Curated annotation (Swiss-Prot):
The gene is SOD2. The lineage of its organism: Eukaryota, Metazoa, Chordata, Craniata, Vertebrata. This is Superoxide dismutase [Mn], mitochondrial. Binds 1 Mn(2+) ion per subunit. The keyword Ion transport does not apply. Residues 1-24 form a transit peptide. Its EC number is 1.15.1.1. The modification N6-succinyllysine is found at K68, K75, K122, K130. It comes from Bos taurus.
Amino acid sequence: MLSRAACSTSRRLVPALSVLGSRQKHSLPDLPYDYGALEPHINAQIMQLHHSKHHAAYVNNLNVAEEKYREALEKGDVTAQIALQPALKFNGGGHINHSIFWTNLSPNGGGEPQGELLEAIKRDFGSFAKFKEKLTAVSVGVQGSGWGWLGFNKEQGRLQIAACSNQDPLQGTTGLIPLLGIDVWEHAYYLQYKNVRPDYLKAIWNVINWENVTARYTACSK
């Protein structure tokens, strides 16, 4: 089960500016399954490149950007601090998003959630089928690169679907707490599904880890 700390993923992965000087470097998280475990829905080549190359690049570039930011803070160089914001957002978002994404998937996934999450989905979207249709449509409809998300609106106490461009993190962009993210960057599917994003969306539902999504919902909805 996830702790309530799961509600603050971005705060946990991107350290406060006040502790940048003593921070530990970010590292690439291990996958909770083998690269080929999600086949035939997502093949091993995609998973290996996606995790060991793309996510690793976000981690490395985030560490570089944070080190440069620390130096700019020490020098009082506000211009440099401002110039580094896009790199921090892009690479920090990439690290946050993918760290959630890997745990949202499972070789034993698919089907429907149970319990409180399923009831919340029915309450906020009418039915699981309608929810699935809406999140699929939002994800397919992302122009260029980005993510489709199921998030929790803490203030309103309800689930919401949203899209984020590029690697913009859901919580930092919309305030929604991320529960389920679907990566629709081409690197997530092109080697297997070419330019047919809807086929990738149809396949990914077979490996959604509803236990993980439910744990995130439980941690954030109390």
